[in-house]
């Protein structure tokens, strides 16, 4: 079916963004970044420009790991949460104090600088175009969107961005995301700096302050993703690799160590 190249994403509009990079002469890293950016638009219920990122990459000679999980704002401390939320000593489940510094864009930049081939701004083009022109919302995305709307609609800014008609989009309805398109263009033009030191960073910090949150421009500007050595485990003739903690991959390796003690083939399917 495939000669040499393939791109797979959970949403059918994500893969063409990656393929476009391959057709333009880009490599697998270019394709992965473009597809990831597109997924923040077409599956906003599962992805976002404010999300984290982890990556394990084989360059043909060496295995690399990248941890771009969000760091806590410097203002977070047990005392901070005691003062704002009574006896609570950890972040709340929702609201401005439930968010950490976004890591995904920094991961895209770091991967591109080390392994990418095409210009960084080209990698953001497909996602920005989809956000501007819109896309038809598929059933699975719509179901998650509608399920989360009742709990999230009271969050500041959520209704304006994700419930433009006062409700979640219907299946097959065209959804446009102009604010995300503008953000992607700013990220593209500044090689990601807009999110950490530029206009988007200032807007994020101002919004957090307005809502009484702890996130500051200093938190955003000081953020850096971390290159790490993947951890691994041999299992029945295979070697599996994961990002070390704070990633959760170590749990999978521990589980494999437990499973290795059992003769799974002798057990019933259920």
Feature names for model-found ranges:
Residues 250:
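Flexible, polar/acidic helix-loop-strand segments at domain edges
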Residues 1-20, 28-197, 201-247, 264-267:
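Noncatalytic scaffold domains of N-terminal-nucleophile
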